[in-house]
Amino acid sequence: MEDTLSLAEAMEDLVSAEDFLDYFAVPYDPAVVHVNRLHILQRFHDYLAKQAPNLPPEESQQRGIYRLWLERAYQDFVTSDSLTEKVFAVFQTVSKPDGGMSSFVSLDKVFRQ
């Protein structure tokens, strides 16, 4: 990946969890990534979405923040697992009015952009 690309351009070219980890120079164990790649990327996305309003305008600072959040997302799955972390809505359970539990995900949430 060329260093002349803007952060946004570089992010568009990244495809896999390994691409992101390599680009941001986050050391990783391929065995951890192999099992948790989608969870790591979703957690990274979730962290960035929460941080977005507070990002500094300077791209170099943004790159550093992105790297920290990606490293944290990866570490979440080094020290835990996907069932414990419940990154995706299908793994999250909510209480039902009858006292039971449900992991139902409505279509409006599935197709939300």
Swiss-Prot record:
User: Could you tell me which species this protein originates from?
Assistant: Dechloromonas aromatica (strain RCB)
Q: What is this protein called?
A: Nitrogenase-stabilizing/protective protein NifW
Quick check: keyword Phosphoprotein in the entry?
Answer: no
What is the recorded function of this protein according to its Swiss-Prot or TrEMBL entry? Answer: May protect the nitrogenase Fe-Mo protein from oxidative damage.
Q: Does the keyword Transmembrane apply?
A: no
Q: How does it assemble?
A: Homotrimer; associates with NifD.
- Tell me what gene encodes this: nifW
Entry-linked InterPro entries: NifW
Q: Mind giving the lineage of the organism this protein is from?
A: Bacteria, Pseudomonadati, Pseudomonadota, Betaproteobacteria, Rhodocyclales
Report keywords, A-Z.
Answer: Nitrogen fixation
Top-rank lineage group of the source organism = Bacteria
